[in-house]
Amino acid sequence: MTQNINKIYLPSPNKYLSREDFLNYTNLMREIANFDPSTKKWYINEYKISRLTKDELKGIIDQIAEYIGNSIYNILSNYIKDDNNIINAYIKGNYIYIRDNLEKYKNLLTYKIKTFDYKEGKYTEEEILLAWQKSYGFVTLRGLYWKLKNIANFDLKPFTNLRFYDIQLKNFEMRNYQINSIKSWVSDVNVIGNGIIKAPTGSGKSVIAILSALEILKNKNNAKIVYAVNSTTLLKQFQNFAKKEDLPFVLVSGEIDEIKKGERSDFIALSISYYYSKKKRNEHEKLKELVTNADLVIIDEAHHTPANIVKSLLLDSPNSIRLGLSATPIREDGKELEIMGLLGKISFTIDYTELVRNRYLVPIEYIRYIPEIPKKLKLKIQDLDDNKDPENFAKYYSSLLRSFEHSPNTNKQIISKIKQLNQYPCLVIVRRIAIAKKLAEIMRENGIIADWVSSKTKLEERMEKIEALKNEKLQVLISTSLADEGLDIPNLRLVVLLTQGKSRIKLIQRIGRVMRVSQNKRKGYILDVIYNHDLFIKQSVKKMNFIENEYNGIITIHY
């Protein structure tokens, strides 16, 4: 049988595969697909699929999903869905109630939690079923409807009936992809009440959030809206943007609580951690009333949704329409199923390549730098390796990192490399406050105008230092993980990573800091410092594989 010219390609594995896993994955793919050497991808072979029963095909798909993720169910839904059977379902608050056998959907509604066993020095997995058996069927989070519909047809009343309005902003130039993202989101909201927009740093998340708020207000004049994120810096930034469009958001956080000062509004810019801390002390009655009655809840940095502090807020707002915003809505720990359950599917993805092509972002020069190990440090590392306790990997890992971080010679090499690149303003990201202070001191001794900042720095002082970097009164600002989210410095030219590790979410957030466009800025530079030890180099290899794929076409990597 001749293949369709328009090949339907399947996603590549979403994780590193051992030799055994790779062989199993390849054998499974051969059951339903052909390999295209020109693209190095598998594409569907309808003849192979036609020879399988639905149960056989579903069994193969369940196994392949372990390697490439649940998107395969959506791609092959037409082959496995039972078109003759209509399942009754309804939405109530946070949940969707299904009158069908849970067993049929278990694979779709199960995720695996990865936890690191420090005693064994390796990851272990635990299966979590995100559904609850009932006498009439089962219940799951309403956003997971998008998973369920891949294998069944449902009789489901729409969540709402929003009309899309062609809104014009007064003070911001809207981009086509921002408008299209809201159109797609409104479409998904009408079905299930929520949706996520995958929006890289620099794509204008604040504008998208404002557009969503204005769409809701067009549909309901007296709508109540909550914009929630964990960073006071981001809250303040959003509040300032929103005021330009006559949306008077009141800021509520541990540092600034404008409600306590007597401010009143139907629009709240809320710190998620502040809400959670108030709730734990049972002091959140007024805030809970605002959250519970919200017509729209916007969750920025939505990849944090599985955290208890975010889940708690969303569960307290059961009937709200929701918008999730994140550059990284897919997590490494398997918990993206919780994100989907509470915020829905990805309604729209804003593409890096398009942003760079249209000069909304700049391309990246990624420099992988491994400082030489001085003799004294080499002896110290050897001693740590020889005497490490196999049952206490965490202590060994921490000691190893600290040895490199506190090495004067290593830090001098790093500073020399920064001076050689000569790309200012520069942001250096470190793990600990003590290192930030020390590096700032060494840099000043070496003629660099440098300062440091952390989450413990008072908001006013923090904003002053960020403004100093933005205005180029500072050459270098050294920061802890405070810089991972919400730092808006368009003219930033260099980000230096001194954190090690392989977290994809943090990496994307940090790379995003340097991709914003400004005058005379043609590229953004990343200096990724890899400490010279097998442990960190192995982490770096996995990180490089991810970066090459994520930023394909807009990144140049220097090894």
Curated annotation (Swiss-Prot):
What is the protein name stated in its UniProt record?
Putative helicase 22
Q: What Gene3D superfamilies is this protein classified in?
A: P-loop containing nucleotide triphosphate hydrolases (3.40.50.300)
User: Which Gene Ontology MF annotations are present?
Assistant: ATP binding; DNA binding; helicase activity; hydrolase activity
> The motif DEAH box: which residues?
300-303
Which PANTHER family does this one have?
A: GENERAL TRANSCRIPTION AND DNA REPAIR FACTOR IIH HELICASE SUBUNIT XPB, RAD25/XP-B DNA REPAIR HELICASE
Please name the InterPro entries in this protein's record: ATP-dep_DNA_Helicase, Helicase/UvrB_N, Helicase_ATP-bd, Helicase_C-like, P-loop_NTPase
- Disulfide bridge positions per record: none
Output the superkingdom of the source species: Viruses
> What are the residue boundaries of the Helicase C-terminal domain, all occurrences included?
410-552
The record places domain Helicase ATP-binding at: 186-347
Q: What EC number(s) would the UniProt record show?
A: 3.6.4.-
Q: Which UniProt keywords apply?
A: ATP-binding, Helicase, Hydrolase, Nucleotide-binding
Top enzyme class: hydrolase
Ligand binding (ATP): 199-206
State the SUPFAM superfamilies in the record: P-loop containing nucleoside triphosphate hydrolases
Database matches in Pfam families: Helicase_C (PF00271), ResIII (PF04851)
- Its gene name is SIFV0022
